[in-house]
Amino acid sequence: MSSISGFLGAIPGAQQILQTMAGSLGLAPLSHPEIASSGSTFQQCGKLELSCQTSYHGQDTCCFNYPGGQMLQTQFWDADPAVGPENSWTIHGLWPDHCNGGFDQFCDSHRKYSNISLILIDAGRRDLLDEMSTYWKDYRGDDPNLWEHEWNKHGTCVSTLETHCYSEYYPQQEVVDYFDKTVELFHDLPTYMTLANAGIVPSYTQTYTRHEVEDALSKAHGATVTVRCRSQRLQEVWYFFNVEGPLQTGKFVPSEPDGQTSNCPAKGIIYQPKTPNKDPGHGHEPTKTRHPHGPTGAPFIGKGNLVVSTMGQQRGCIIGRGTWYSSGTCADFRAKRASGDTFTLSSRKGPCAFKDDIFTCGSYISSPAEFSAEDGKLSYHGNTTFFADKAPKGKVQSDIFVSEADHPIELSIAWRG
C-alpha cells in the first residue's frame, strides 16, 4: 500500500503539468526569481502600504489587504481529548478581520472547496499536507473538514488571494498560498516554547495568572495577544498582524488587537497537559485499543448496525457496500460466529472483508474476514482503530482502511444490535 501511495505521489498533478507546458512554450520557468508566489506569478506591486495603518483610498486590493487588513493567526491547545503533539500548540486558522474588529465570511461560493488534501497534492505540496496533518488538527478527528472550513470561511475573504491577482494563475494556487502562509506564521510563533521559557508549562497542579500568560506571549510577539479559556482551562491564543503588501509575499507586522479581548480569569488558569495524569485519583487513564492477547468481549451475534465514532463522538455508520456514511439509514449487518470468539460480517450486498486494505462488502468476496470484539468495538487482528482519508459529509461517502498509511482520520466501529 505504501509503495502504491509513493508511486501515486510521484505522478505530476494538473498544476505541475500546466507549469511544464508553460516552460515548453517559452514562458518563464517556475523557478525564475521574478516569480513571487509559490510557483506562479503574482502581479507586480508598486509602493507597499501597511494595512490598517494606512486608510483605504482606492488602492489595488491585490497589493493592499482590504477590507480584511487585520490578520489573526489563531492557535489551539486541545488537551481533553488530546490533539496534536504534546509539546506543541496546533493551528486554528488565519483570519482577515476588518481593522475595527468586524469580519466578512464565506466570501466566494465559486471558490468553495472540499478537497484541500487533493489540491495540495496536485500542487506538489505533500510536504505542506504533512505539516498540516501534524499541526493543523481538529479535536473531533476530522482535520480535512477543519481545513475546508477555514479556507471557505476565511481564506476566500483575503483580497490579495483573489484569482485575478495572479498574472499567471494556476487552478487553486491561492488555496495553496493561504495554507502555506498560515503554517509559516504558526512555526514563527512557537507558543509552547515561549510559555515554557517563561516557566509556564502544562500541569495538573500548578495554575497561572492571565497576566503571566499574556505577558510572556506578548513580549515574544512584539504586541498584545489575546488568550481564550474554557472553564478556566487555557485553550486558544490569537496573534494579530497588519500586512505590508499581499498575503503571499508581504511583511507581517505584529499589531495590537482589533477590539478582541481575553476571556480567561485573572488567576487560576489551568494549562492542562496533553499526556494522561498518572495519578489514579484523577481518573485519567490512557486509551487502550490493542489487545495482543486476544479478544476481551463477547462476539457480535445476529442482526445489527456498525456505528462509526471519531474522538469518542458518534459520526454516522457503515452502509451496505462497506463505506462510511453520515446521512440516511444505517445498513443492517449480520454477524455469524466463525471460530472461538471470532465472527464474520455480511450485508445485503454480500460478505465483508478488507480488499486492497479497504473494508468492502459484496457477493464477489470469497473469503470473509474474521473479526473479534474488544470492549464493544469491532477488532481486526487485535486492533480496534481503523482509518479514513476524510469524514463523510452529505451524500459523500468515505472508504475505511485497515492500515494507517496516509489516512489521517482515526475511527472506531461499534455494534448496535
Swiss-Prot record:
**Catalytic EC class:** lyase
- Catalyses which reaction? a ribonucleotidyl-ribonucleotide-RNA + H2O = a 3'-end 3'-phospho-ribonucleotide-RNA + a 5'-end dephospho-ribonucleoside-RNA + H(+)
Compartmental location: Vacuole lumen; Cytoplasm
Q: Where is the composition biased (Basic and acidic residues)?
A: 276-288
A single GO molecular function term of this UniProt record: RNA binding
What is this protein's function? Rnase which modulates cell survival under stress conditions. Released from the vacuole to the cytoplasm during stress to promote tRNA and rRNA cleavage and to activate separately a downstream pathway that promotes cell death. Involved in cell size, vacuolar morphology and growth at high temperatures and high salt concentration.
UniProt protein name: Ribonuclease T2-like
